[in-house]
Amino acid sequence: KYMAPFSPTDVLEEYTRPVRILRSGIMDIVPAISDRHIIEVPGYGEMEGFLTDGLRSLIETLPSSDMYEYTVRWPGHIQRFIDEVEKGTLDHETIIQEWKYDEGTPEFTWLMVEAVSENNDVMAWNVIDEGGKDGHSMARTTGLVTAICTEILIEDENVVPPGVHPPEALPDYAVSRIISEMKSHGVVIEGPEIDL
């Protein structure tokens, strides 16, 4: 059973909004929930990945020839969504109730970032959280970043110039602190260490 850890309306939009990707250095727009495939999630088993439009600012700020974001769900979840859309039986109010978060149900958040160099060297990182007494996993993995960034900005208002900035504009010391503090709160971050 899927539980939306944030607004179900936003999840539904994620499943329908056209997807921006980079392919051979060129931005392309492809249909949402395309390129479906099975992904083995260590410790959790098989899940299904599909393209969604989550690259946001990265597509403009991170030099890359190819860049994609896949959302991962339990097998069968997205097919049920597709079937209901095709039959015309998708009801937003029903979905909001069915996807309501249940604190008694075990859940987890998993993120994998994979970078492939021009020489085909691969580096990969995994972020895993199963929630805890201080909140569910998605709240922890996103909220901790926000809270730590806020602390950094309070301590040093010049960390970035005034204005709106993407997360990747943060200086290296801020990124190192975010990673360190997330780990100290029990969020598992695995992968090669990078000197920042």
Protein language model features and the residues they cover:
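C-terminal catalytic/substrate-binding lobe primarily of soluble NAD(P)-dependent oxidoreductases
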Residues: 1-196
